[in-house]
């Protein structure tokens, strides 16, 4: 019996649960809908806040962009004034030339020419290369000015191969050339000189050889001695032997054979010099044996008996 009562109670509870399930489900759905609605409203509010934040941040981005730097040399319009100061570019609209003139006079500047506006326009073509410099605001004004001066100087450069100075041109024209190139003295020595120069050089060489072809002491030819040396009469006046003795002892050596040979040569020359009529006008030069100095051995050999005879003669007289 108790078991049957318990089973009946369990069945009633199950029925009650089955009846209450749809109501709970409906109630749960309503709660979920309410939560979803709350979440949706929160998301909408966040989106509205984001849009408002974007709207607040957009105005600075929507501000008109800063005017591009324009050079004072390249005005956009006749009444537009552009100033460049410390890398900053300032553009002023509707500025008449009269106002600019008044400001310049107030600052103590000179009077602006009346045709300045007309003169600036042609410079636009010439100053196109300065746009990249003048449009940059990160470069100081001094740097911009120095770059402009550099570019102005670069325009004057001339890379053509030509002589620029008149002095250098004159020097180049005076210099000797060999196959179109400048030739120095060393290169010109191998080349033949002009006929006049050759004759002059030959004449001077012959005179030089005739003057200094023989030793003044012994008459030795220049070709018969290793080198001509300095003597009392100057350089290249003595042969090698005479010059060495003169340099070492300060005296000239005796050359009897050379004197005899020189006298014979002089005799032959005098015999050869005959007048056209066949009569010799020069006297015959005969070497005098007394003038020929004896050699050192002969002097030593002959002097001893002579001295003994001289010494013995007074002794004989005294006896």
UniProtKB/Swiss-Prot annotation:
Biased composition (Low complexity): 1-15
Keywords of the record: Activator, DNA-binding, Metal-binding, Nucleus, Transcription, Transcription regulation, Zinc, Zinc-finger
Stretches with biased composition (Acidic residues): 32-60
Highest taxon in the source lineage: Eukaryota
Region annotation (Disordered) ranges: 1-74, 292-319
Location of the protein in the cell: Nucleus
PROSITE patterns in UniProt: CCT, GATA_ZN_FINGER_1, GATA_ZN_FINGER_2, TIFY
Domain CCT span(s) in chain numbering: 143-185
A GO BP annotation: regulation of DNA-templated transcription
SMART domains named in the record: TIFY, ZnF_GATA
Family designation: Belongs to the type IV zinc-finger family. Class C subfamily.
Biological function: Transcriptional activator that specifically binds 5'-GATA-3' or 5'-GAT-3' motifs within gene promoters.
Protein name (database record): GATA transcription factor 18
Highest classification ranks of the organism: Eukaryota, Viridiplantae, Streptophyta, Embryophyta, Tracheophyta
């Amino acid at each position: 019996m108790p078991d049957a009562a318990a089973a009946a109670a369990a069945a009633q509870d199950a029925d009650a649960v089955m009846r209450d399930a749809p109501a709970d489900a409906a109630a749960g759905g309503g709660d979920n809908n309410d939560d979803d609605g709350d979440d949706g409203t929160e998301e909408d509010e966040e989106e509205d806040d984001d849009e408002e934040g974007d709207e607040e941040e957009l105005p600075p981005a929507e501000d008109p962009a800063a005017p591009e730097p324009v050079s004072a040399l390249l005005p956009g319009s006749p009444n537009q004034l552009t100033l460049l100061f410390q890398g900053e570019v300032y553009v002023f609209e509707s500025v008449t030339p009269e106002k600019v003139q008044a400001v310049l006079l107030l600052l103590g500047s000179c009077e602006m020419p009346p045709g300045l506006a007309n003169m600036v326009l042609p410079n636009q073509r010439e100053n196109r290369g300065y746009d990249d410099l003048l449009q940059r605001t990160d470069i100081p004004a001094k740097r911009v000015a120095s770059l402009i001066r550099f570019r102005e100087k670069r325009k004057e450069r001339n890379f053509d191969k030509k002589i620029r100075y008149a002095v250098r041109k004159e020097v180049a024209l005076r210099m000797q050339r060999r196959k179109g190139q400048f030739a120095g003295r060393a290169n010109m020595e191998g080349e033949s000189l002009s006929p006049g120069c050759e004759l002059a050089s030959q004449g001077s060489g012959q005179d030089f050889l005739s003057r200094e072809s023989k030793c003044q002491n012994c008459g030795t030819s220049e070709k018969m001695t290793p080198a001509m040396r300095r003597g009392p009469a100057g350089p290249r006046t003595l042969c090698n032997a005479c010059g060495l003795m003169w340099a070492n002892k300060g005296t000239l050596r005796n050359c009897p054979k050379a004197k005899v040979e020189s006298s014979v040569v002089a005799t032959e020359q005098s015999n050869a010099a005959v007048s056209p009529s066949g009569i010799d006008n020069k006297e015959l030069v005969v070497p005098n044996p007394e003038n020929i100095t004896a050699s050192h051995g002969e002097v030593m050999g002959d002097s001893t008996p002579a001295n003994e005879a001289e010494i013995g003669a007074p002794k004989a007289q005294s006896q």
